[in-house]
Amino acid sequence: MATLFIADLHLCVEEPAITAGFLRFLAGEARKADALYILGDLFEAWIGDDDPNPLHRQMAAAIKAVSDSGVPCYFIHGNRDFLLGKRFARESGMTLLPEEKVLELYGRRVLIMHGDTLCTDDAGYQAFRTKVHKPWLQTLFLALPLFVRKRIAVRMRANSKEANSSKSLAIMDVNQNAVVSAMEKHQVQWLIHGHTHRPAVHELIANQQPAFRVVLGAWHTEGSMVKVTADDVELIHFPF
């Protein structure tokens, strides 16, 4: 058996091929797993569990079917869907996890997260992240009428795209010291995350021992998952 990890699908109505690929994944590979972990940015945007977007209901039903089949499903918030709440989690049969979670998998101690907190060189983003994660601000935003939230979300995505266009790729990648610090804080030799859209398996030293950082790919033109078994940790790409 295997435990599966995915991230950065950025589901939206404008990308039906990605949605179709995810549905096939849920109906196939996911049903064979010991567990499925979604490490953030499942959706391109999330303005509240009360958004009647049919895509959200469709995805909730599809994930719930996996959960109901006996495969537990877990979710860590990303930078795009950090407002995804208990209502959607309940509808989809997912368990919400904290932003950093340590798992014991087949004899390995593995830290999982979305990965945006590791990009500490991007001071502008980290300041923005701190602001939008304030509970009072989230409560205020979610109390706004849906049409107002949609307008704000469109403006924020446009601002983010403009800001990122002027940033170097290095700034938007993880900071190595932040990676080592997180792994040593949790006493792990394995880290799995997404966010950067740069799939790879990196070797490093943490806790004065060899360690590994496995980065999930985004679902732009193909699927990406990490498959952990008793024998191996594999980064796998597959067609939609």
Swiss-Prot record:
Catalysed transformations (reactions): UDP-2-N,3-O-bis[(3R)-3-hydroxytetradecanoyl]-alpha-D-glucosamine + H2O = 2-N,3-O-bis[(3R)-3-hydroxytetradecanoyl]-alpha-D-glucosaminyl 1-phosphate + UMP + 2 H(+)
A Pfam family it matches: Metallophos
Binding positions for Mn(2+) 1 per the UniProt entry: 8, 10, 41, 197
UniProt cross-references to CDD domains, sorted A to Z: MPP_YbbF-LpxH
Biological process per Gene Ontology, one example term: lipid A biosynthetic process
Pathway: Glycolipid biosynthesis; lipid IV(A) biosynthesis; lipid IV(A) from (3R)-3-hydroxytetradecanoyl-[acyl-carrier-protein] and UDP-N-acetyl-alpha-D-glucosamine: step 4/6
Residues that coordinate or bind substrate: 79-80, 122, 160, 164, 167, 195
Role of this protein: Hydrolyzes the pyrophosphate bond of UDP-2,3-diacylglucosamine to yield 2,3-diacylglucosamine 1-phosphate (lipid X) and UMP by catalyzing the attack of water at the alpha-P atom. Involved in the biosynthesis of lipid A, a phosphorylated glycolipid that anchors the lipopolysaccharide to the outer membrane of the cell.
Protein name, UniProt field: UDP-2,3-diacylglucosamine hydrolase
Provenance organism: Escherichia coli O157:H7
Taxonomic classification: Bacteria, Pseudomonadati, Pseudomonadota, Gammaproteobacteria, Enterobacterales
Gene: lpxH
